[in-house]
Amino acid sequence: MPSRFDFFSGPGERPFTPRLARLARGVAGLAALTLFVAAAGLPAREVARAGELDAVYARHGNNMPVITNDGDLAVYEGDPGEPAVDCAGLAGPRTMVALVFGQSNAANTVDRGYDATLPVYSWHDGQCKRVHDALPGASSANGSTWSRLGDRIVTSGLYDAVLFVDIARGGSSILNWGAKGGLRALLVETLGALRENGLAPTHVFFHQGEADCYLGLSGKEYASVLQDVLGEVRSRVGEGCDIFVSRASLFLDPVCGDRQSPVCYKSCPAIVAAQTAAADPGTRIFSGPNTDLLVPWFDRNDGYHFTSRAADRFAAAWMPLLVRGETSVPTLH
């Protein structure tokens, strides 16, 4: 997951705010936020949540990855020779519309070589096109799990067609997608554009966590930002959309660096526990696959990203979860 600001770089290679100054700013920010929300008449629980979120950014915000749009992290714009199809013709109860976001393993970092053959489409920049391997709109230009999953969904009869909207960004932390992160705007703008085009998401797939394991977020801190992200998504997709939170934290420790050695791989059970605890079937939030278990270290092509074999397994693992969480088309707010 190389980038100008690579969260797999050693701590000595990153700028840090002096501890006391950062703490002072964080305390001041918390106090100001508490006064503001109290004055606004928000419930005590919301005041507490806002304070917790502010504390996470006060502690980790200076180490938030900087997401670039160049090199291996450039957004794939799609094959210019692939003709666009009528997006309006895809809308309907027999089409799954799935928003995908998170970090690199939800983007286009899988080994190349899979060509979707059934009615599987992507939406990017207002255009719908047939999907072959990589999905336009996500970072990198290799292969994708989602083209594989799309074929499986159509083959199963769960839906007649699948439209993926993939905005995953390699190297991103949940902090980037949270209230104070630069990718929040991308998330909100994408959902707004889908609404304007009459493409209400039926599903949302979130796969992310490796960056935050490296950054050292605690389970409680991760849960605080995840709750904020899920709340934002729910407010924009409506109550009928199924939201899936994958479990993911495993990464190759760059201090060790030997991708052939299992001892060089680290995971964060507390982050995985926070991802699992986010599930609430009563509100249509479900657990996705646990890729820490599903994709072991030897099935990662560069120490981080899924091999084609792992992507096949990841796609297959979604199917029983989707059947359990099957939904009708919701109404966007």
Q: What is each stretch, according to the model?
A:
Residues 31-39:
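Hydrophobic core
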Residues 13-32:
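N-terminal Sec-pathway targeting helices
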Residues 25, 38-333:
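Cell-envelope and extracellular/periplasmic
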Residues 9-12, 20, 40, 209:
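Prokaryotic Sec-type signal peptides and long signal-anchor helices
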Residues 1-10:
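N-terminal intrinsically disordered, acidic low-complexity segments at the extreme N-terminus
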